[in-house]
Amino acid sequence: VEVKDNREKEPEPIVPAWEQKKKSKVKSFDLHPDIPMAERHNFDLANNQVEEVNKKERFHRNYAAIKVLKDCQNENRFATPDEQKILSRYVGWGGIPEAFDERAGAWHTEYAMLKNILTPEEYASARESTLTAFYTPPEVSTAIYKVLEQMGFQEGNLLEPSCGIGNFIGMLPKSMENAKVYGVELDTVSAGI
């Protein structure tokens, strides 16, 4: 015996457009979907500040970070927590044009090291960045986030249009942890880090 429900179904309520949940037009992707979440580690930039050092030391920190990046890419894996510390010390090439000048005698070794580790495209991009690369100091990031907090921002979309290695994004306060953060970076080495 089959019994039919002849009751009419309640119509769905009409919801104004501004109250409707919108589906994002931007699709997220996972660069390494095969790596389990348990093997992923978020690096805490706020508690791992990078101190100022001279040009040669900045070069060697950058070089070490590129080496870690290349290892991770070649092995199709994320950086370990120890490797993340090395990556966090990458500051780009702004202010170190000597490393790209084959005539700078004191920088001959570093010049050769860069030519050896970077692809021609990466090298050209890094060389171009010597005049334009700038990494936002933590104090500036913190001040901007404080203003956003005072304005009541807790969740929504945040765009970092020139994110470098993610220093600004890495300073995101707990109060905004539900925000969707989008980062764009032209330099492939910085973006990879």
Regions found by a protein language model. Give the residues of each.
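Class I S-adenosyl-L-methionine-dependent methyltransferase catalytic core
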Residues: 9, 18-193
